[in-house]
From Swiss-Prot:
Pfam families: Ndr. SUPFAM superfamilies: alpha/beta-Hydrolases (SSF53474). InterPro entries: AB_hydrolase_fold, NDRG. Keywords: Acetylation, Phosphoprotein. Belongs to the NDRG family. It comes from Rattus norvegicus. The modification Phosphoserine is found at S331, S334, S335, S338, S341, S352, S361, S374. This is Protein NDRG3. The lineage of its organism: Eukaryota, Metazoa, Chordata, Craniata, Vertebrata. The modification Phosphothreonine is found at T322, T329, T332, T355.
Length: 375
């Protein structure tokens, strides 16, 4: 394989300003389906056509969002077209969270998080999809992880943004951080997505999502989805012990990329998840100068990381990968964990003097530790 070139990546396109924020939420060339499952109806949006035996990229959004507000800025980003031309994309909306969704009838029992995960196999069967590469954010990351634990044969890879593997996570934390005791679900959701610094500094972005959550998402249905997420079980995943082959161990078997912004309220939860996963097939990506929605605020960086991830799985090997600057932190937890990682080289950039130190990932590095990169 030709040596990958590493250069500094900077975001070059403004996002979610008054001119293009709405446009980036739009779907282009998509087909919508309502699919019946044992746990109720689910709304999906298909983008592109399946490519032979390749997996489909399947997304699942976070609470307070739908596939449009969670993922369309990312998938409409110009550089993502290099990926989407090779893969069909299936966006899944949690029940009642899609645009213009009607309210559920009185007494409706919303699916649990486990049941939401079990709605996915009938979706794949209905659409004749054999396997997926999942991209989930927050609650969606939890659902896709549960799905992968229950059906490992259907999942080739996972990109998990802001995942919390624990039974109690950010919602309790977010509510306690708000001034006073509030029952405003919009404020709770905003505190779930964004840290205090971002809430105060990125006012345009916050206002865009405040209006979206309040006006575009059915509030009764949102309360039900929020309640389901608050009632989630611990994923109960365990990190394998080096040299011990225990098939009873509960862990993600597929290639996994964990993503979190360094200013996100989810940092501790993602680090906790990383500590429980198999370091052989897990990469932790911390995105600098980024808050709670990296796929919205820094789509260029995430696109480049996703390209590396897919290349590590054997897909799109000819993709242009020259923009992502990767740095290896100096803590012991940041050592490269596997020669099979999609990131085969690491670069530490010294911003003060402009020098770069190239660091290979040969066998001399500690293979018992997860690879951690930052960009």
């Amino acid at each position: 394989m030709d040596e990958l070139q590493d250069v500094q990546l900077t975001e070059i396109k403004p996002l979610l300003n008054d001119k293009n924020g709405t446009r980036n939420f739009q779907d282009f060339d998509c087909q919508e389906h309502d699919i019946e499952t044992p746990h109720g109806m689910v709304h999906v949006t298909i983008r592109g056509l399946p490519k032979g035996n390749r997996p489909v990229i399947l997304t699942y959004h976070d609470i307070g969002l739908n596939h449009k507000s969670c993922f369309n800025t990312f998938f409409n980003f110009e550089d993502m077209q290099e990926i989407t031309q090779h893969f069909a994309v299936c966006h899944v909306d949690a029940p009642g969270q899609q645009e213009a969704a009607p309210s559920f009838p009185t007494g409706y029992q919303y699916p649990t998080m486990d049941e939401l995960a079990e709605m996915l196999p009938p979706v794949l069967t209905h659409l004749s999809m054999k396997s997926i590469i999942g991209i989930g954010v927050g609650a969606g990351a939890y659902i896709l992880s549960r799905f992968a634990l229950n059906h490992p044969e259907l999942v080739e890879g996972l990109v998990l943004i802001n995942i919390d593997p624990c039974a109690k996570g950010w919602i309790d934390w977010a509510a306690s951080k708000l001034s006073g005791l509030t029952t405003n679900v919009v404020d709770i959701i905003l505190a779930h997505h964004f840290g205090q610094e971002e809430l105060q500094a990125n006012l345009d972005l916050i206002q865009t999502y405040r209006l979206h959550i309040a006006q575009d998402i059915n509030q009764e249905n949102l309360q039900l989805f929020l309640g389901s997420y608050n009632g989630r079980r611990d994923l109960e995943i365990e990190r394998p012990i080096l040299g011990q082959n225990d098939n009873r161990l509960k862990t993600l078997k597929c290639s996994t990329l964990l993503v979190v912004g360094d200013n996100s309220p989810a940092v501790e939860a993602v680090v906790e998840c990383n500590s429980r996963l198999d370091p052989i097939n897990t990469t932790l990506l911390k995105m600098a100068d980024c808050g709670g929605l990296p796929q919205v605020v820094q789509p260029g960086k995430l696109t480049e990381a996703f390209k590396y991830f897919l290349q590590g799985m054997g897909y799109i090997p000819s993709a242009s990968m020259t923009r992502l600057a990767r740095s290896r932190t100096h803590s012991t937890s940041s050592s490269i964990g596997s020669g099979e990682s999609p990131f085969s080289r690491s670069v530490t950039s010294n911003q003060s003097d402009g020098t770069q130190e190239s660091c290979e990932s040969p066998d001399v590095l500690d293979r018992h530790q997860t690879m951690e990169v930052s960009c």
